[in-house]
Amino acid sequence: MCSSDLHDYALLSKAANAVFLMTYEWGYVYGEPQAIAPLPQVRAVLDYALSVTAGENIFLGAPLYAYDWPLPYEKGRTRAETFSSQAAVARARLVGAEIEFDETARSPCYHYFDKMRREHVVWFEDARSLRAKIALAAEKGLQGIGFWQAGRELAQAWPLLDALLTLETL
């Protein structure tokens, strides 16, 4: 699952001062609906990377965005809408959806029906899912954590980081 001939982690680690490890996009725009960065898969990627290199120059990449898939999913046809995690929470409120938390993936999601009565599923990140990723980065002795698409901000991320970590601008 995580081993790949596409990336030589050991060589990349030696050649770079820091490596931003993309551990997300398990759920993606054209893919089947699922968590964007489910913790078991994130852990597996890290375990593989750490089996061939040390963690002191690795930053765990974490997403700050959401995907909204219309259902039923049709391979090659269904395309998820992308927006911020903050917008995902606002949409849940707007449509009256109950946000659930998948304990295995350690990611929030919800279902709703649009005006055309078509069902949707939304997966995103929140303080709980980010906290799990921050804890994993600390557990594995990584250099830190980095966010992808910081322009699609999640207001919960900054106080959480402030409380749990010493921030350093690179």
Regions found by a protein language model. Name each.
Residues 3, 64-135, 165-170:
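Glycan-binding loop/region signatures in secreted carbohydrate-active enzymes
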Residues 4-94:
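Substrate-binding surface in catalytic domains of secreted glycosidases
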Residues 36-43, 124-131, 152:
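Soluble non-cytosolic domains of exported or imported proteins
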Residues 1, 17, 143:
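Conserved acidic residues
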